[in-house]
Amino acid sequence: MDKLLERFLHYVSLDTQSKSGVRQVPSTEGQWKLLRLLKQQLEEMGLVNITLSEKGTLMATLPANVEGDIPAIGFISHVDTSPDFSGKNVNPQIVENYRGGDIALGIGDEVLSPVMFPVLHQLLGQTLITTDGKTLLGADDKAGVAEIMTALAVLKGNPIPHGDIKVAFTPDEEVGKGAKHFDVEEFGAQWAYTVDGGGVGELEFENFNAASVNIKIVGNNVHPGTAKGVMVNALSLAARIHAEVPADEAPETTEGYEGFYHLASMKGTVDRAEMHYIIRDFDRKQFEARKRKMMEIAKKVGKGLHPDCYIELVIEDSYYNMREKVVEHPHILDIAQQAMRDCHITPEMKPIRGGTDGAQLSFMGLPCPNLFTGGYNYHGKHEFVTLEGMEKAVQVIVRIAELTAKRGQ
């Protein structure tokens, strides 16, 4: 596992937060810095067909070292970190041989506690890499980036049989844009794995169907003293809309395969208001029903408004559940599960309550389930990753490459 930790710490030192609402891809300059660094490292490692597109997709190939009809496979991670929490001046803490209890995050009152995060009880004796309480860590997905780079180094430096290994690093995954500019044909893999999951053993091939709902409300503002029969309060209409959304179908009240409506932002005045929801559901029919529900709510609340006042609703699908594409190729999951078992890991098949680049890529002709990275609590100050989990991810990547070669020989 030469340089795994060193690589990871170097990558998280670069601020690569993506930014929503920006037309350009990548959305931030910091992502270019990491992409150029990775390009240089791939060149130094001796990979071939290295390309960095104008949209920030970095691709490279580790050529096969054995003969045979071996399918080319790929591994993909994203370089951006979430815009939900600061990713600037990340200052990781390394906690060796974790013995339980609270971990102080920097100087202050912030702690990483097993009371709030019981998974810590399962990680006794391991090396934890945490934040200092002021930023996110960036293990999502720089752990995946470091693991792929380290796996390439292992395959390059050891006589482990493998076919062509394609790797790609994408931008703007956190804002849903990176995979839209991914050239599947140029990539040249028959299938791939994103390395963007969580705890050791996770293997994910189901994700939410996802849509965004943007609501614009135009009211009418007059002096409150003479408002009767004239004022139309856009904020009151917004409140009525949200009151119609099922309260027990929110992110904080759902789990597993349950879908939800999530009010992500709301702002406005009496005259004008805006609301932004996201809709998520694993079941396609329920997903479509949720979209219809939002339209029905808007019509109900907007009924009878003055013609100059209105509610405008725009729904846009973001991505779909990749299950329907991945299950057509069961060997992809079989190989990953066998690789985990060979590395003394129990595979844990679970749905992604979110999305990955792999969801979009699967519908673009590249079946692409998701492998674990060893990280936890993404997108916030309690994010952490275990060194042992990262090492296991490297072992699984290498073993997948080896098993694929054996099937083709």
Swiss-Prot record:
GO cellular component: cytosol
Record localization: Cytoplasm
Needed cofactors: Zn(2+)
One GO term of the biological process aspect: peptide catabolic process
Enzyme Commission number(s) from the entry: 3.4.11.4
Keywords assigned: Aminopeptidase, Cytoplasm, Hydrolase, Metal-binding, Metalloprotease, Protease, Zinc
UniProt lineage: Bacteria, Pseudomonadati, Pseudomonadota, Gammaproteobacteria, Enterobacterales
Cofactor stoichiometry and binding remark: Binds 2 Zn(2+) ions per subunit.
Protein name: Peptidase T
CDD domains attached to this UniProt entry: M20_peptT
Record gene name: pepT
UniProt KW Thylakoid keyword: no
Reactions the enzyme catalyzes: Release of the N-terminal residue from a tripeptide
